[in-house]
Amino acid sequence: RALGPLIPSRLFDQFFGEGLLEYDLLPWFSSTISPYYRQSLFRSVLESGISEVRSDREKFTIMLDVKHFSPEDLSVKIIDDFVEIHGKHSERQDDHGYISREFHRRYRLPANVDQAAITCSLSNDGMLTFSGPKVPANMDASHGERPIP
């Protein structure tokens, strides 16, 4: 449930690679909730670099907004029980000057996710979706290291 701009609606809500605005530098506009939560007065929640993790009985899913990165800028790997997502692009020009971006995310996979059946896709609007089916408790899920295309 969303509780407005004061409380993040998603655990990993972040504004990576967005740059600073003038109100970010003024102390009376800063968030009193937490020094790690950046409240935005001018951006919608849908443009905030959202990362959402879902886990139900059938599957485990990660959805990550990577709209500022091309597919060539992204790397997705499984190392043991972790998914590692890395994005980096070199300096390029935008409306406000030059900018370079980089992020690194690491998520622990549930033990019952079948790592051999994991898929990853990137939508046209920049949403990276990583999904893996869960196996019943009596079956063994495969583990190891492999890159996800």
From Swiss-Prot:
GO terms, molecular function: metal ion binding; structural constituent of eye lens; unfolded protein binding
Example GO biological process: lens development in camera-type eye
Binding residues for Zn(2+) 1: H89, E91
GO cellular component annotations of the record: cytoplasm; nucleus
Subcellular location: Cytoplasm; Nucleus
Residue intervals passing through the bilayer: none
Domain sHSP: residue ranges: 41-149
Positions bound to Zn(2+) 3: H143
Pfam families on file: Crystallin, HSP20
Binding of Zn(2+) 2, residues: H96
InterPro entries named among the record's database cross-references: A-crystallin/Hsp20_dom (IPR002068), Alpha-crystallin/HSP_16 (IPR055269), Alpha-crystallin/sHSP_animal (IPR001436), Alpha-crystallin_N (IPR003090), HSP20-like_chaperone (IPR008978)
Highest taxon listed in the record's lineage: Eukaryota
Keywords: Cytoplasm, Eye lens protein, Metal-binding, Nucleus, Zinc
PROSITE patterns with a match to the protein in the record: SHSP
Family designation: Belongs to the small heat shock protein (HSP20) family.
Assembly behavior: Heteropolymer composed of three CRYAA and one CRYAB subunits. Inter-subunit bridging via zinc ions enhances stability, which is crucial as there is no protein turn over in the lens. Can also form homodimers and homotetramers (dimers of dimers) which serve as the building blocks of homooligomers. Within homooligomers, the zinc-binding motif is created from residues of 3 different molecules. His-89 and Glu-91 from one molecule are ligands of the zinc ion, and His-96 and His-143 residues from additional molecules complete the site with tetrahedral coordination geometry.
Function description: Contributes to the transparency and refractive index of the lens. May act as a chaperone, preventing aggregation of various proteins under a wide range of stress conditions.
The protein, known as: Alpha-crystallin A chain
Organism from which the protein derives: Columba livia (Rock dove)
Gene name in the database record: CRYAA
